[in-house]
């Protein structure tokens, strides 16, 4: 056993781990961050959008120095069938209030910068080391074991990502429910800034965020995403883990077909593949949030299931940052009390309940169940495409009133199904 004992050991140098370390180090705590990858962020994947409000509260004006890509000013949502796209396009000027902004990011650039901020504040960082187990005395976590080394701490913060094996070893994270997870795949495709601006109708450092439902996930629970970076685009999709067994295509094949869609192919024409990644994504919402606190240990970020897929936007990093701040604040207070028991660390849950994390997780708790409706990803995109096709087809034959067009296609799904799905959607949102 080492003679050195840290105030806190953070396992994982993603967004949550780095921010937790930063906040604690600023308060003068002795903090160690351990990351199994060779650098912070090298094993992390995100679609690519950071809502700024939570990081802005910790590092005011961070975007001036952080390696963010573009500020999002164009929002698009599309229903896709194999041959068509129906798109809602919303454009606005860049928000003047920093807390209202959002940015496209690449994690292999953002995460090292965040870890650097934590190190400058006094945190210690050890990359390339895997934590094999948590050290316990009775029911209390007292440190970590990495190989033959044992490191002690008053508290351990688990920021080890979705499907936390360390959390599971404590019995805090239950066995995986496939319906609570999705598989995400992403390509980063290089284009010139001029090509990106021309193809997405943006200027300067403006950015676009685009979500897709329907054919990208082959009609299964999931969808596609596209985010513009400075000189590349992040293009990918997610598919529910519980649905993959029933899929007619592999997830990589879904991505290849998505890239060849008529609405996507011209946007990536001439681009160079820079990066390919795949990752598990938490999709269960409030239902998958595990036990967050025990004696000497807390769980933050993706490891805690803090992710919201609302259909029109996806949030993960801002919730991870808020949870990290709540955990760090709790550790600072626990040190003042010299009490790192579960009852003392329960302050973390109270901090979360007062933040956007649990308020929003609670408010949108019915969204995951809504997303399990297969009609959202198969029949509804086809219905909307067929209605639009009829509206814009002029062939010399008498046109039906639009009302009859809509009702004709709606009856294929069933008016009762439409009514039930509409009520369920309105309730969930």
State each model region's role:
Residues 117-264:
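Predominantly flavin-linked oxidoreductase catalytic cores and closely associated redox partners
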Residues 326-377:
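Active-site-proximal substrate-binding core of FAD-dependent oxidoreductases
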Residues 27, 37-84:
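N-terminal FAD cofactor-binding segment of flavoenzymes
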Residues 16, 39, 163:
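Conserved Rossmann-like nucleotide-cofactor binding loop
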Residues 370-429:
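C-terminal auxiliary extensions adjacent to catalytic cores
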Residues 6-33:
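N-terminal Rossmann-like FAD-binding beta1-loop-alpha1 element of flavoenzymes
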Residues 216-221, 230, 243-323, 339-342, ...:
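FAD/FMN-dependent oxidoreductases across multiple families
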Residues 96-116, 244-250:
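Short beta-strand to alpha-helix junction loop
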